[in-house]
Amino acid sequence: MLTHDDDRYEDEVAWWALRPEVKLGPPSWHWVERAMASIRLLERPGALEAVQTPILLLATTADQLVSTKRVIADSKRLLHAETLIFGKEAAHELLREADGVRDQCLKRIDAFLDQHAPRP
């Protein structure tokens, strides 16, 4: 559900054992209410269209936690958005994925930052 890379997932499990306070559990009702309030704000006409900051959205159609259809739809409302969408080769945690996916993500992030926030 989170990654296809067993070693990276086991690393995460090891951190949870070492530091149980960093493990996320299910969302609280407050979290759900705040998430819904945020969604309502973003659904307002003009809300996303007003964003001037360049944004890179990374997603996968195989994500079982995030709606990729919504990511793609919202990216079309963002005037300065770029997307990188994976298929079944990637799960939710793209930066903890198998090297092929992770490397593509990092390369795209580097290129995006070089374009929009170049080093002095």
State the predicted function of each range.
Residues 66-67, 97:
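Short glycine/threonine-rich loop-to-helix capping motif typified by GTGT followed
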Residues 51, 57-59, 63:
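Short beta-strand/loop motif that positions the catalytic acidic residue
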